[in-house]
């Protein structure tokens, strides 16, 4: 089916979203005491609530402080770690129709990323979770 799953494993919440080609499916936020439990629970729940099968998933893209605990493919699917600044910048840019944006992440760590059609630049701050 060509589904790509993006998961941000933060210090207090796990955010998950899927894309089918360029179409974004409904995002979800999950809380759990364990970041690994939150990752696997969020992924399973997301598949269930969106009527998706594991075989539909072409790739899992993870970021956030909790991604350091993941050292093997998630549920056997191809899994890739994405830099938090890149993930936030790309996501923020996707959500707007502007040609140049400054994306601000306001979580446990706060940072600024400038994104244009051809460039992404971390302006300052830290990504802590």
Regions found by a protein language model. Give the residues of each.
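Short glycine-aspartate micro-motif
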Residues: 2-8, 59-61, 100-105, 123
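Short glycine-rich, Thr/Ser-proximal phosphate-binding strand/loop in the N-terminal lobe
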Residues: 3-41, 45
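A short acidic Gly-Thr/Ser loop motif
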Residues: 8-12, 65, 105-109, 126-129
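Short beta-strand-loop/turn "lid" adjacent to the catalytic site in phosphate-handling enzymes
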Residues: 29-32, 43, 48-84, 115-120
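Glycine/small-residue-rich loop that forms an oxyanion/phosphate-binding "nest" at active or ligand-binding sites
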Residues: 71-105, 112-113
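Glycine-rich phosphate-binding loop plus the immediately following alpha-helix
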Residues: 93, 117-129
């Amino acid at each position: 089916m060509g589904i790509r799953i993006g998961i941000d494993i933060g210090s207090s919440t796990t955010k998950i979203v899927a894309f089918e080609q360029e179409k974004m499916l409904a995002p979800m936020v999950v809380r759990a005491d364990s970041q690994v439990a939150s990752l696997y629970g969020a992924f399973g729940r997301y598949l269930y609530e969106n009527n998706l099968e594991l075989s539909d998933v072409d790739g899992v893209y993870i970021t956030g402080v909790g991604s350091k605990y993941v050292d093997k493919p998630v549920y056997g699917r191809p899994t890739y770690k994405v830099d938090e600044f890149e993930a936030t910048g790309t996501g923020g840019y996707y959500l707007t129709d502007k040609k140049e944006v400054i994306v601000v992440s306001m979580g446990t760590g706060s940072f600024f990323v400038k994104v244009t059609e051809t460039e992404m630049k971390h302006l300052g701050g830290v990504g802590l979770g």
